[in-house]
């Protein structure tokens, strides 16, 4: 593959994709690594019902970078793709397609037909996914992908569940859960917290008259609610026994609430009466606003009870309790012995969020639509109505507001294992680190029992067969066991294939419970189920159990025998939302099964938002098409843009197309230019001569190599792009520019080696151009011809060489400083500087002096002198010391004392500190705690001061300066003319100009071939190039002739 300057970035990536496919590079790489130590990676399965977006591309890029990098370090990395197939995303799309709004319509249609519809769209966009993943340069195994709907996966989910059941973690109960009326199912706590929106709602303060007098007054208790639709289900009022409550009077009526909240709900004049503790109210009965459930009064309902969750900063300090619709309410009723855990309470709302016949006034009305009707009905009992704006949870799938509702559910007992979860979390390396103890750690510390059952249809059925009274429960652990128990051949575990199976136990008839698993449970089983643990996968429809010999009380032997090689994962990576999703379920299941974490290292990425800061939306069209971005700027540029941003450290990214363009401009194009320079310099070979900056560029490259390795070994991706920019700048704008003539003459050995290694280092990040660069380099070496396939992605990471030195950095700093002075004082680079003096310590000047000729040439200087400060008495240097708070804040106890010491330092003391590190032993302050600024003043010429050196510039103009300026201007004119003619570097020309002065002066400084004639040659050849050079008010005709035309 030869370098072709006519190819665009998109052409190159298309060419490389074809090369990979034609040579089966990915497959070959796996073959080459099959006997190496394994590095385990889990790929979180996406849904193929939607198209891939920038969030998927980000996560996929992070995974690809890490796995390619680990491959380079002698690891075997299985990169197996997976598909999430079950759950609400699929069902909701089918419901929309078929116009289904209630669960009864599914039952009438038939579960078999409904699930067949679901299955038909599961892989709807799989081809688009594969196409996008390949275009972004990710290597992953699609051919051997797992699907959560396959029998081999589902039977393994059953086995995992059966182990949890045997360990006593599974139970059935009632709980107030987040409930989606749009999808007619419960949601997990993490799902419920994933989609909050600001909404306007009506809030009301309702009067609840006490049945008996309080302080000889007929008093109404005032309770506040933002959900008026729950008032028909009121069962109690809750106060805090330690709060002070106030009786107050308005228009001869008496009310009770917190005194500090009265003004928030009342603007009339009030008369204050008794102030007392909430404990006095506990046990008092009141009249409920509706009479639907009056029969519960004999059970102790419709009384005031105590609860610690009551707030003194919002509402009235008195909570209207509807235990069927509030978790705190339900728990408070349990704590007050009004009900037992898992008891039923009035719950007159169905799965569609509509009132049932128990609340006959509002039967069939959707709860949120009933708010205004209820307020109107209770107008005589409403103390006040206010509209409020507040955050409210919405269903992440249907976008309808959630309600909290008492439901029957199956739970995995997690709360008893919080200490284990936290202990295992300590083993995990989180990137960024604060996720461990903040977002994820706090979630773990408040872990609740996991309601894992869902009242849906398209999912893995929960393998529990129960008697009508639940006195007998049988947990089936595999498809094979179900075959033995039922005598029926099992080819599919979806409910339509197994729900007709009736089993018996102890003389009782058992039927399967109707629920399916929360699809998060399936995802959490992925480490085991993708390998069909503990079964051997035969095909997608049949499994054979692998027999294990292990004690019933010790399942660890199964773990040791079967999944030790693949568990825990060395690495996983997904978005920040997965701290409550996949990361959490992986961690819970592995902890409960094996008391081990499921993964060792995890990178948590943030969210990619539109440029305006809003969520990316197809409807709003507020983001570009990823495929167009990749086609325009290249997938490599998109990859590097994403992983070099804070989004790989759990921050959000406002996606900007210009950011991708900048990466192309700063990385790919300079790299391409260096490659082009190399390939066009190969016509001659002269590798014997050692170049002045060879040691420096080798040192710089090894620093780059080591820095990338250090960051990547710590899973810190964001710094790599900046390191690549810096190295390419050093290579292109320093090494190549300074040595361009020598390299053009064939001295390319160092450049070849560096480009080849650079291609290998960059291959995980920019896989396309790395491959192109590598292949171009291989083809440039005639002795490297081979029929075998070779790819940059087969190469191991280069080892750092202990070679080179960094002394040119001092010269570089000097050159940059002189350029800064030129810019500041608007002195053209074409104007030579008469003299430059460098003042510094002896070591600095010794290193810089090695490169005097380079400094002179790069800065266009006549005379460069290195002098001591004492040799320039007119120079005045002032030193100033400031506290460095970045380091001082690490020890807050001593910070103030150290600041006082730093502020008292004298000029001589600061000067000593600038050159000698005596700070800690002499002043009790570390040098790193002090920032030293140097200010220099010089009476004549230009002056620049840094902490390392001072530069004095004599910029006076004399004849020598003017001559060199003219020569440089004329040489620059000739080079531009050559470029406009399209001449190659090795094309030699003769120059004709009608000015002896220009000829003589230019020849002093530049090797230009002038015509021997004293004037313009006539007639002018048709192939000659003509232009005009302006000099001293004259327009001089200049002719350029290729030697072959003369």
Curated annotation (Swiss-Prot):
CDD domains linked: IleRS_core (cd00818)
Show where the record puts the motif 'HIGH' region: 46-56
Question: Tell me, what is one Gene Ontology molecular-function annotation carried by this entry?
Answer: ATP binding
Q: What is one Gene Ontology biological process annotated in the Swiss-Prot or TrEMBL record?
A: isoleucyl-tRNA aminoacylation
The EC number(s) this enzyme carries: 6.1.1.5
Report the SUPFAM superfamilies cross-referenced here: Anticodon-binding domain of a subclass of class I aminoacyl-tRNA synthetases (SSF47323), Nucleotidylyl transferase (SSF52374), ValRS/IleRS/LeuRS editing domain (SSF50677)
The protein's annotated catalytic reaction(s) are: tRNA(Ile) + L-isoleucine + ATP = L-isoleucyl-tRNA(Ile) + AMP + diphosphate
Enumerate the subcellular locations listed in this protein's record, separating them with semicolons.
Answer: Cytoplasm
Alphabetical UniProt keywords: Aminoacyl-tRNA synthetase, ATP-binding, Cytoplasm, Ligase, Nucleotide-binding, Protein biosynthesis
**Per the record, what is one GO cellular component?**
cytoplasm
Classify the main location: cytoplasm
Q: Where is this motif: 'KMSKS' region?
A: 615-619
Q: Where does ATP bind?
A: 618
Family matches, as Pfam families: Anticodon_1, DUF5915, tRNA-synt_1
Entry similarity comment: Belongs to the class-I aminoacyl-tRNA synthetase family.
**NCBIfam families, from UniProt?**
ileS (TIGR00392)
Q: What is this protein called?
A: Probable isoleucine--tRNA ligase, cytoplasmic
């Amino acid at each position: 593959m030869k370098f072709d300057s006519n190819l665009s970035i998109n052409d190159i990536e298309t060419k490389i994709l074809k090369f990979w496919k034609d040579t089966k590079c990915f497959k070959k790489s796996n073959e080459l690594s099959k006997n190496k130590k394994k590095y385990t990676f889990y790929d979180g399965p996406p849904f193929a019902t939607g198209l891939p977006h920038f969030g998927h591309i980000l996560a996929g890029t992070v995974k690809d970078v890490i796995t390619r990098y680990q491959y380079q370090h002698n690891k075997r990395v299985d990169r197996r793709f997976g598909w999430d197939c079950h759950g609400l995303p699929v069902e909701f799309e089918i419901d929309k397609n078929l116009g289904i709004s209630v669960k009864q319509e599914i039952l009438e249609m038939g579960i078999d037909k409904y699930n067949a519809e679901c299955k038909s769209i599961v892989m709807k966009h799989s081809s688009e996914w594969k196409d996008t993943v390949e275009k972004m340069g990710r290597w992953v195994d699609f051919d051997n992908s797992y699907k959560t709907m396959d029998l081999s996966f589902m039977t393994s989910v059953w086995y995992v569940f059966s182990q949890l059941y045997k360990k006593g973690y599974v139970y059935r109960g009632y709980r107030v859960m987040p409930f989606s009326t749009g999808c007619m199912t419960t949601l997990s706590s993490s799902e419920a917290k994933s989609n909050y929106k600001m909404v306007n709602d009506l809030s009301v303060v309702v009067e609840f008259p006490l049945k008996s007098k309080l302080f000889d007054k007929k008093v109404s208790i005032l309770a506040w609610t933002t959900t008026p639709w729950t008032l028909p289900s009121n069962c109690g009022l809750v106060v805090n026994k330690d709060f002070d409550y106030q009786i107050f009077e308005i228009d001869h009526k008496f009310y009770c609430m917190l005194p500090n909240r009265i003004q928030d709900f009342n603007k009339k004049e009030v008369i204050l009466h008794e102030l007392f503790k909430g404990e006095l109210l506990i046990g008092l009965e009141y009249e409920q606003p509706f009479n639907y459930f009056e029969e519960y009064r004999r059970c102790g309902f419709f009384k005031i009870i105590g609860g610690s969750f009551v707030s003194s900063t919002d509402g009235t300090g008195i909570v209207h309790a509807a235990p069927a619709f509030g978790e705190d309410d339900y728990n408070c009723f349990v704590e007050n012995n009004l009900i037992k855990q898992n008891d039923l309470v009035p719950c007159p709302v169905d799965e569609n969020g509509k009132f049932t016949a128990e609340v006959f006034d509002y039967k069939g009305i959707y709860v949120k639509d009933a708010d205004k009707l209820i307020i109107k009905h209770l107008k005589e009992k409403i103390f006040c109505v206010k509209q409020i704006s507040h955050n409210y949870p919405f269903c992440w799938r249907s976008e309808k507001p959630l309600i909290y509702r008492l439901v029957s559910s199956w739970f995995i007992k997690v709360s008893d294992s919080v200490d284990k979860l936290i202990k295992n979390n300590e083993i995990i390396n989180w990137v960024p680190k604060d996720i461990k103890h903040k977002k994820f750690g706090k979630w773990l510390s408040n872990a609740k029992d996991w309601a894992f059952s869902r009242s849906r249809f398209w999912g893995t059925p929960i393998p529990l067969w129960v008697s009508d009274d639940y006195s007998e429960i049988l947990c089936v652990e595999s498809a094979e066991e179900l075959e033995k128990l039922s005598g029926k051949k099992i080819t599919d575990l979806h409910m339509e294939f197994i729900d007709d199976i009736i089993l018996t136990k102890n003389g009782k008839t058992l039927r399967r419970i109707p629920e399916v698993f929360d699809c998060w449970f399936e995802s959490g089983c992925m480490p085991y189920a993708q390998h069909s643990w503990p079964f051997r996968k035969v095909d997608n429809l049949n499994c054979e159990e692998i027999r294990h010999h292990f004690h019933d009380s010790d399942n660890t032997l199964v773990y040791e025998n079967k999944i030790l090689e693949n568990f825990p994962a060395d690495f996983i990576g997904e978005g920040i939302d997965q701290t409550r999703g996949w990361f959490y379920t992986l961690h819970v299941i592995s902890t409960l099964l094996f008391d081990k974490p499921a993964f060792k290292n995890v990178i948590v990425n943030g969210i990619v938002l539109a440029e305006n800061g809003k969520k990316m939306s197809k409807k709003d069209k507020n983001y570009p098409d990823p495929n167009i971005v990749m086609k325009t700027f290249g997938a490599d540029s998109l990859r590097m843009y994403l992983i070099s941003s804070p989004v790989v450290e759990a921050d959000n990214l406002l996606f900007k197309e210009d950011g991708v363009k900048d990466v192309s401009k700063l990385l790919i194009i300079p790299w391409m230019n260096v490659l082009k320079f190399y390939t066009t310099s190969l016509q001659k070979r002269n590798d014997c001569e050692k170049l002045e900056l060879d040691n420096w560029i080798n040192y710089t490259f090894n620093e780059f190599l080591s820095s990338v390795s250090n960051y990547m070994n710590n899973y810190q991706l964001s710094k790599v792009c900046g390191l690549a920019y810096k190295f390419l700048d050093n290579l292109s704008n320093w090494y190549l520019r300074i040595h361009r003539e020598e390299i053009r003459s064939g001295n390319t050995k160092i450049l070849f080696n560096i480009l080849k290694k650079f291609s290998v280092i960059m291959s995980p990040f920019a896989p396309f151009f790395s491959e192109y660069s590598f292949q171009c380099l291989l083809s440039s070496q005639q002795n490297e011809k081979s029929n075998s396939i070779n790819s940059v992605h087969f190469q191991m990471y280069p080892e750092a060489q202990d070679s080179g030195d960094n002394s040119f950095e001092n010269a570089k700093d000097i050159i940059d400083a002189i350029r800064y002075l030129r810019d500041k004082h608007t002195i053209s680079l074409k104007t030579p500087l008469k003299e430059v003096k460098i003042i510094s310590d002896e070591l600095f000047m010794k290193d810089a002096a090695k490169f005097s000729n380079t400094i002179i040439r790069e800065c266009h200087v006549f005379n460069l002198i290195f002098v001591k400060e004492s040799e320039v008495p007119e120079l005045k240097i002032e030193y100033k010391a400031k506290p460095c708070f970045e380091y001082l804040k690490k020890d807050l106890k001593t910070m103030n004392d150290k600041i006082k010491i730093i502020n008292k330092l004298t000029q001589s003391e600061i000067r000593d500190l600038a050159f000698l590190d005596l700070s800690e032993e002499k002043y009790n302050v570390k040098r790193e705690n002090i920032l030293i600024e140097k200010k220099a003043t010089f009476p004549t010429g230009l002056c620049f001061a840094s902490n390392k050196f001072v530069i004095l510039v004599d910029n006076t103009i004399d004849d020598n300066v003017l001559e060199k300026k003219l020569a440089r201007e004329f040489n620059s004119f000739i080079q531009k003319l050559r470029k406009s003619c399209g001449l190659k570097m090795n094309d030699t020309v003769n120059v004709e100009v009608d000015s002896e002065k220009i000829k003589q002066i230019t020849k002093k400084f530049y090797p230009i071939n002038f015509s021997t004639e004293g004037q313009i040659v006539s007639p002018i050849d048709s192939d000659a190039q003509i232009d005009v050079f302006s000099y001293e008010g004259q327009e001089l005709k200049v002719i350029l002739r290729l030697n072959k035309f003369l």
